[in-house]
């Protein structure tokens, strides 16, 4: 893991969290229990504080940063998709930020909300609970349905379980030179499917 102290502040990581070895945590970073941090994620606590609360996930290539005297927060069970950027914002409890979305300074994503992939949430946006945000700039399309929230929670559960699985089942290795016979497939822990397959 790449952990760096910055001007005396050292990242804090709960022992039940999983941080991929290629992720970088700098300075004022606080990571809660059961959190999953994916490959190449960057949490730069060299200005503002970066907080991932219990059960949340920050996937591959995500960035968290913010100005001095600000907190960038992903609340409990928050779900941050591949390549998303969070800058000085707050993501509410049980909310999802889709892949390659950008959430700007002072924005608040309401609890149980979903930000669609590739969306841009402008600075200062003040969201409410269970909003579906879409587009660039993002607008409120409608309320999140019970089915969509259930789908989100299954995905988050997969990442909470993945944090546990990675702590024991992930190891650096050398590649094989050919595919072995009867190569097995990996299984998740829920019955979640891509939205297009539902």
From Swiss-Prot:
GO MF annotation terms: transferase activity
**Comp. bias regions, Basic and acidic residues:** 180-198
Instruction: Give yes or no: UniProt keyword Repeat.
Output: yes
What the entry lists under CDD domains is as follows:
LbH_paaY_like (cd04745)
Q: Which GO terms describe its biological process?
A: carnitine metabolic process
Record key words, sorted: Repeat, Transferase
Q: Where is this region: Disordered?
A: 179-198
In its keyword annotation, does this UniProt entry include Mitochondrion?
no
Q: Read off the Pfam families from this record.
A: Hexapep
Pathway-wise, it operates in: Amine and polyamine metabolism; carnitine metabolism
Which HAMAP family does the entry link to? CaiE
Q: Give a short account of what the protein does.
A: Overproduction of CaiE stimulates the activity of CaiB and CaiD.
Q: Which family does it belong to?
A: Belongs to the transferase hexapeptide repeat family.
This chain belongs to the protein called Carnitine operon protein CaiE
The gene that this protein is the product of is: caiE
């Amino acid at each position: 893991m790449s952990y760096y102290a910055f001007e005396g502040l050292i990242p804090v990581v709960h022992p039940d969290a999983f941080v991929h070895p290629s992720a970088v945590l700098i300075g004022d970073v606080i990571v809660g229990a059961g959190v999953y941090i994916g490959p190449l994620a960057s949490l730069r606590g060299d200005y503002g504080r970066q907080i991932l609360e219990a059960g949340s996930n920050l996937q591959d290539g995500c960035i968290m940063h913010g100005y001095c005297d600000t907190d960038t927060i992903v609340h409990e069970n928050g779900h941050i998709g591949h390549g998303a950027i969070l800058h000085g914002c707050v993501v509410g409890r049980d909310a999802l930020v889709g892949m390659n979305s950008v959430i700007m300074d002072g924005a608040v994503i309401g609890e149980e909300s979903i930000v669609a992939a590739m969306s841009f949430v402008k600075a200062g946006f003040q969201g409410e609970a269970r909003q579906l945000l879409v587009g660039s700039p993002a607008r409120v399309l409608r309320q999140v349905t019970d089915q969509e929230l259930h789908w989100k929670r299954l995905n988050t559960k997969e990442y909470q379980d993945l944090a546990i699985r990675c702590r024991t089942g992930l190891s650096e290795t050398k590649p094989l030179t050919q595919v072995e016979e009867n190569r097995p497939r990996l299984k998740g822990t829920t019955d979640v499917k891509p939205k297009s397959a539902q």
